[in-house]
Amino acid sequence: MMGFLNLYKPKGVTSHDVVDEVRRKLNIRRVGHAGTLDPFAEGVLVVGVGSTTRLLEYLQVERKRYYVKALLGVITETFDITGEIVEERECNIPDERIIDVVKSFVGKYKQVPPAYSAKKYKGERLYKLAREGKIISLPPVDVEIYGIDKIIVKKPHFSFEVEVSKGTYIRSLCMDIGYKLGCGATAKELKRLSVGTFDIRDAINPFEVGREKLLESLIDVQKVLPLPKVEIYKDFVENIYNGNQPTLDFVKEMVDSFSKDDDVMLICNGQLVAIAKAERNSKFLEKNLPRGRIFKLKKVFKEI
């Protein structure tokens, strides 16, 4: 059993709860997710099933889109409404100023990750350390805000949709907006609308569907992974399973072109056999000897 699932995580549950629900309904232990969503947040959560968990790192998820509603004049420990209130301030700022400040964050900027987050410090999750009273201040990281639109101001709230780079914390963005306004702000509602090509309009709630719906919703890894494909002969599949490095005589067809050092998918009869690193440019493979090694195996999959 292999494939990705485009799931909808409802409010009030953890990303791990979603994984557990999939494990229970599909009766499979090997399930993992890409990109944690906080319990108070909802929206798209990409899940890998079976050996697909080993492919989550190859997903093209550099861009994510969110809807967020923030509360003005409130600062919390966690940068969201679930945290303890640290400070409250009056906020009599004109709507136009709020809109201008929100828009000013489009582009690259250095962002400090929240102390309460799934980010790791010396192997430990920050939120676990914070709950133990160990507040870790991490250095700012470079993030990019690709665009902000649909800004609505209804004091004491304001909301907008935002497209961001991987690793951007929307809670931190709300805090930074509040800081620039001079009155503070905290995230009140958060919905992830998309992760790469995974869109909320296609997402399914694993708590509301059964096993059959989950199975029919599995997405073939080849439709999602942005890697070039190479078709290999069936006679050589067992060689790969035994750890033999692919040579030119393994290759049936170069489905896509690739460069040296690119990761490629080795497929046979429509099934993924392995992920391998190209040791030659596809343009020059014909110059190789039939038994000359052209790929180095990285991950092998035996579901074929």
UniProtKB/Swiss-Prot annotation:
Reactions it catalyzes: uridine(55) in tRNA = pseudouridine(55) in tRNA
Origin superkingdom: Bacteria
Species for this entry: Thermosipho melanesiensis (strain DSM 12029 / CIP 104789 / BI429)
Its biological purpose: Responsible for synthesis of pseudouridine from uracil-55 in the psi GC loop of transfer RNAs.
Gene Ontology MF term list: RNA binding; tRNA pseudouridine(55) synthase activity
Enzyme Commission no: 5.4.99.25
InterPro entries, alphabetized: PsdUridine_synth_cat_dom_sf, PsdUridine_synth_N, PUA-like_sf, PUA_sf, tRNA_psdUridine_synth_TruB, TruB_C
Disulfide bonds: none
Record protein name field: tRNA pseudouridine synthase B
PROSITE patterns per the UniProt record, alphabetical: PUA (PS50890)
Listed GO biological process terms: mRNA pseudouridine synthesis; tRNA pseudouridine synthesis
PUA domain span: 227-302
UniProt keywords, alphabetically: Isomerase, tRNA processing
Entry-linked CDD domains: PseudoU_synth_EcTruB
Record-linked Pfam families: TruB_C_2, TruB_N
Active site: 38
Protein family per UniProt: Belongs to the pseudouridine synthase TruB family. Type 1 subfamily.
